[in-house]
């Protein structure tokens, strides 16, 4: 029977002294006079299985030895036995090896430590390393844990358009898409591009958020969420930014900002706890090889009674009075930079922290204006090591206030009349949030660079797939 390493390592006694079949790849080969060894992995588990090949007992194994190369895919038949030196370690005594796909000395993933900078140049092969194997098994588990949480909370899973005419965030970092022939553009009489000739008959873009559409869904189905790709033409060349990433977006009818924060905290603790249970071996490897103290940090996260919550003004006062010589001097009315987020989460609070009631001038048009007329009912969740993980708000449900806010910011209602309809017909208090999926993975894995938690990362001047 075909056995996966995950099942074998989790319950080796079930397979002891039994003939089994394995399919996977060679991680390493070691040759001795009377026997040779293969470090074998099939991608389902962090640990390799040692394959023992006794040449004096099997002429076939001696013959195939010359064809064995690191990276080759193989099929193995043999018996699982205990290592004669270390009683609690199992290995496979091979009877037959079949090479399914050959490799060569040119294979770039050799059994040594490779820098992440080197591995980023070969994303199609780096997935075969232990660190990236761990990261992407955890990525899969987090996806499933998120869906499980919202299923149990009776949320409707939905999808929002990837192609749009709106800039939901108002940042302007949009990828424009077109079917027009850029070599032979059709111009109008006043020398402008004639978008009537384009596929949709108007300018269109890749979506930067599905929030606006989710609000329509929430006012129909009460509680909704989506988990999908987001695109931003952001030239920031930092360890936190890429052009394509995944976003968890949630909208809830009849929910205020407090309910928003409650669901954020409960969801995150549930996901982290689930990951600690289902990915113990991968997290142990990352703790020992990538981010010392990772497991302790995650256990402390789920052990917190509740995340601290402060107003923007209080957070800014903490920074101003800290006595720290920040590169970017904090002042009331400014946004937080990475160094400010690090101070608040890693020095002052030493924990995640909710920051609420931000100045309306630095937040989006759809956020509910507070009674003071100066701030909006929004929240950012900052966490150690990552910074901003979640951004959310109570949405403005009053039609006239929303229209006035759009006028203040010179936002045309031409493409947003449908959004205003949500306030015209059956408006209600509602709130929601967005969570950067890859930023959550950075926190969970201890891997610093967002490009290392996405299989095929895209950034400015960098696209190969």
From Swiss-Prot:
One Pfam entry name: tRNA_anti-codon
Coiled-coil boundaries: none
CC annotations in GO: cytoplasm
Keywords recorded for this protein, A-Z: Aminoacyl-tRNA synthetase, ATP-binding, Cytoplasm, Ligase, Nucleotide-binding, Protein biosynthesis
GO MF: asparagine-tRNA ligase activity; ATP binding; nucleic acid binding
Reactions the enzyme catalyzes: tRNA(Asn) + L-asparagine + ATP = L-asparaginyl-tRNA(Asn) + AMP + diphosphate + H(+)
Domain of life where this protein originates: Bacteria
Enzyme Commission number, as recorded: 6.1.1.22
Ligase is among the record's keywords: yes
Signal peptide as annotated in the record: none
Subunit-level organization: Homodimer.
Name assigned to this protein: Asparagine--tRNA ligase
Native species: Phytoplasma mali (strain AT)
């Amino acid at each position: 029977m075909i056995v996966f390493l995950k099942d074998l390592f989790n319950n080796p006694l079930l397979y002891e002294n039994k003939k089994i079949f394995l399919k996977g790849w060679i991680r390493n080969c070691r040759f001795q006079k009377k026997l040779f060894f293969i470090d074998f992995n099939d991608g389902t588990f962090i640990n390799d299985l040692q394959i023992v090949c006794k040449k004096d007992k099997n002429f076939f194994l001696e013959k195939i030895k010359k064809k064995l190369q690191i990276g080759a895919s193989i099929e193995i038949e043999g018996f699982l036995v205990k290592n004669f030196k270390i009683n609690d370690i199992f290995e496979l005594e091979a009877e037959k090896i079949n090479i399914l796909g050959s490799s060569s000395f040119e294979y770039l993933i050799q059994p040594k430590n490779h820098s992440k900078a080197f591995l980023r140049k070969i994303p199609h092969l780096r997935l075969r390393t232990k660190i990236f194997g761990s990261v992407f098994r955890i990525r899969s588990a987090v996806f499933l844990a998120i869906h499980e949480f919202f299923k149990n909370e009776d949320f409707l899973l939905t999808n929002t358009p990837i192609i749009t005419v709106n800039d939901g965030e108002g940042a302007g970092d949009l990828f424009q898409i077109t079917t027009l022939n850029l070599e032979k553009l059709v111009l109008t009489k006043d020398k402008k591009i004639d978008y009537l000739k384009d596929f949709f008959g108007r300018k269109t873009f890749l979506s930067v958020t599905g929030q606006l559409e989710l609000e329509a869904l929430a006012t129909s189905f009460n509680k909704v969420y989506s988990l999908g790709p987001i695109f931003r033409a952001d030239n920031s060349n930092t360890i936190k930014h890429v052009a394509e990433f995944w976003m968890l977006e949630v909208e809830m009818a009849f929910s205020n900002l407090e309910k928003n924060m409650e669901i954020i905290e409960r969801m995150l603790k549930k996901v982290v706890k689930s990951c600690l249970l289902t990915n113990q071996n991968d997290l142990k490897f990352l703790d020992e090889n990538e981010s010392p103290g990772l497991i302790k940090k995650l256990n402390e996260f789920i052990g917190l009674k509740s995340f601290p919550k402060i107003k923007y003004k209080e957070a800014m006062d903490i920074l101003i009075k800290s006595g720290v010589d920040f590169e970017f001097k904090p002042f009331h009315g400014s946004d937080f930079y990475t160094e400010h987020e690090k101070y608040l989460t890693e020095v002052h609070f030493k924990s995640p922290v909710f920051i609420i009631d931000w100045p309306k001038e630095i937040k989006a048009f759809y956020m509910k204006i507070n009674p003071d007329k100066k701030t909006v009912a929004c929240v950012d969740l900052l966490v150690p090591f990552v910074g901003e993980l979640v951004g959310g708000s109570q949405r403005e449900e009053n039609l006239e206030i929303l229209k006035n806010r759009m006028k203040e910011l010179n936002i045309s209602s031409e493409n947003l009349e449908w959004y205003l309809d949500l306030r015209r017909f059956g408006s209600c208090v509602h709130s929601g949030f967005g969570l950067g999926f890859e930023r959550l993975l950075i926190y969970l894995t201890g891997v610093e660079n967002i490009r290392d938690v996405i299989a095929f990362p895209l950034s400015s001047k960098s696209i190969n797939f």
